[in-house]
Each structure stands twice: as C-alpha cells, then as structure tokens.
Amino acid sequence: MEPDAKSPTPGTTETPRELATADILRVMELLPHRYPFLLVDRIVEIDGDSSCIGIKNVTINEPQFTGHFPKVPVFPGVLLVEGMAQTAGAICCAHTLTRDTRPSRVYLMTIDKVKFRKPVVPGDTVEYHMRKLTNRRTMWWFRGEAKVAGTLVAEAEIGAMLVTE
C-alpha cells in the first residue's frame, strides 16, 4: 500500500487522530480476522480512541446463508455482535499504533445488554457505531449500535482486553 495522508509513514509514529478512515486493506492491517470471519469491510470514521463507524456489506455469497435460512436468508445476530466487536477492536488497535507498541490481540471479554431489533438481509449495508465508555489499563468497554439505512437493528455493550505479546 502506498503511503498517503491517511496511512502512516513507515518507521514513524501515528497519533489516533491521524487515522480517520480505513479501506479493507487497512482494516486487515489493524485486525487479525480473515474470511469468512472478517466482518468489517471499511472504517468510515475514527475519532481518536472515543468512537468509530465500521461498514459491513452483507451479500448472499457469504457462507452463513447456506443454512441461515435457505429460503429466507437472515444475517445471524451473533455476527452483528462480532462485527461490533471487530469495529471496537479497530479503535483499540488504531489508538495504540506506534513504532514499538501495538496489541498483538484484542480479545472479546464481555457482551451485555444485547438486543436485536430488526433482521438484516443480503443487500443491506450495516453501519457499526461504536463508542468507548471507559478503559482501565488493558480493559476497554464500548457501547455499540448496528444500523441499516439509519434504522437500529442491534445494540450491545462489549468489553475487550488488549494483549501485547
């Protein structure tokens, strides 16, 4: 990837505000997940370590639609929660970008207050709106909402732990 205003220059430090968006290649640098479990296609906004908006384009080609459900495909709610968690993980990784320190993993630790409001179907574009509630050392807590066309489809509170090996 060629350096641009949104990418860090090799060998330099990047502050949280410098990473404002991320295409799929940048998302793959931030997160360890890969197909079929990478559930964030793009980051359209990162505001320091306080909030982030991730995008997931849902297509019928995804493996979960083979069995969930063949005649009426619905994107599994647990994958909406995982997408929120991955978007939160992008906040953690983007915030800690420096030459010397970066978490090697961000582990999902807690999921609370989960509600599924409306089904998500192939053709939908999901926006994951994540907001940091607080953090203590390596533990971070977030409030998330998944929206399709501005309509709330799911919400959750998520706790994560950053691990540096």
UniProtKB/Swiss-Prot annotation:
What EC numbers are recorded for this enzyme?
Answer: 4.2.1.59
Q: Name one GO biological process term.
A: fatty acid biosynthetic process
The record, for Pfam families, names:
FabA
Q: List the disulfide bonds.
A: none
Q: Where in the cell is it found?
A: Cytoplasm
Name the enzyme group at the top EC level: lyase
In the record, what terms sit under GO molecular function? (3R)-hydroxyacyl-[acyl-carrier-protein] dehydratase activity
Tell me yes or no: is ATP-binding among this UniProt entry's keywords: no
One Gene Ontology cellular component: membrane
Query: Per the record's keyword annotation, is Signal included, yes or no?
Result: no
Keywords from UniProt, A to Z, are:
Cytoplasm, Lipid A biosynthesis, Lipid biosynthesis, Lipid metabolism, Lyase
Q: CDD domains from the entry?
A: FabZ
Catalytic activity reported: a (3R)-hydroxyacyl-[ACP] = a (2E)-enoyl-[ACP] + H2O
Q: What does this protein do?
A: Involved in unsaturated fatty acids biosynthesis. Catalyzes the dehydration of short chain beta-hydroxyacyl-ACPs and long chain saturated and unsaturated beta-hydroxyacyl-ACPs.
> NCBIfam families recorded for this chain?
fabZ, PRK00006.1
What family is this protein classified in?
Answer: Belongs to the thioester dehydratase family. FabZ subfamily.
Kindly provide the name given to this protein in its UniProt entry: 3-hydroxyacyl-[acyl-carrier-protein] dehydratase FabZ
| Origin species | Methylobacterium sp. (strain 4-46)
Q: Which gene does this sequence derive from?
A: fabZ
